[in-house]
Amino acid sequence: MTQVKVAALQLPFSDCVEENIEAVSKLVREAAAQGAKIILPPELFEGHYFCRTHDEDHFARALPVGEHPVVAAMQALARELEVYIPTSFYEADGHHHYNSLAMIDDEGEIMGVYRKSHIPDGPGYSEKFYFRPGNTGFKVWKTKYGTIGVGICWDQWYPETARAMMLMGADILLYPTAIGTEPHDPDLDTSRLWRRAMIGHAVSNVVPVVASNRIGTEGDQRFYGHSFICDERGDYLAEFGPSETGVLVATVDTVQAKKHRAAFGFFRDRRPELYGRLTQDI
């Protein structure tokens, strides 16, 4: 299919799983009613962003993909509405814990699981305490509407993530996110940088990008929203500010993007034989 409507959800979350499932489900229904076929909720929407502090009690939040209530709820919703819902969740796998995403298709089936590759560790974002670096490698999924590539939050800052998914055949890049203020520097607003990084991926890979972020204040941290959808030239098709709750829906044209990608020549002119340094540790 040439054109597809995609959606990004933006909303605040409580620390009650059931309340958050209900809130996200409501917005998923709104997006589907507007014709969206690929609907992206924010990262770890099951509760508060617990990685602000070190607390071993939070490990109990993690569950296997087949037992997680968020995944089960989105499977049922995807099946009912016939939409794709890339679903972020806290995964337990034996002794290991991952920041993961289940790609749920329009029949409610799990196409696969991606585990976040890049794990941050800084004030307010102490993810290394809770998450093991992903062992799935980057993933893309073929859907009825093109091939989807998904990176999770911190992955979005790395051009290697986007380029790897593009080389695997991605037609659209999606980034569920939980990002906000920096507790160590109240004057630092990364929302502009955050958007520019992903707009850069859109331009340098000539690909539409969808980013979904939470809003609201949790403890001493304010999550700044600014969810957006852009086309393959980096132009905004839809965007939110720092406080709106709702649904962004826009139409992207993957065939047009493919044509523009060929015309720009970025992939034609690649020199992989020169890039060996990229795979070496510093």
Q: What kind of feature is each model-predicted range?
A:
Residues 1-7:
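Extreme N-terminal starter segment of soluble prokaryotic enzymes
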Residues 10-15:
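Short polar catalytic/cofactor-binding loops
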Residues 17, 25-107, 111-113, 179-200, ...:
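Cys-nucleophile CN-hydrolase/nitrilase-fold catalytic domain and related Cys-dependent amidase chemistry
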Residues 19-28, 158-163:
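Short, acidic/polar
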Residues 63-66, 76, 92-172, 176-177, ...:
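Active-site catalytic loop in hydrolytic enzyme cores
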Residues 63-85, 153-247:
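CN hydrolase (nitrilase-like) catalytic-core segments centered on the catalytic cysteine
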Residues 87-89, 100-103, 139, 227-229, ...:
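Short beta-strand scaffold segments in enzyme catalytic cores
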Residues 255-282:
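A conserved C-terminal secondary-structure "cap"
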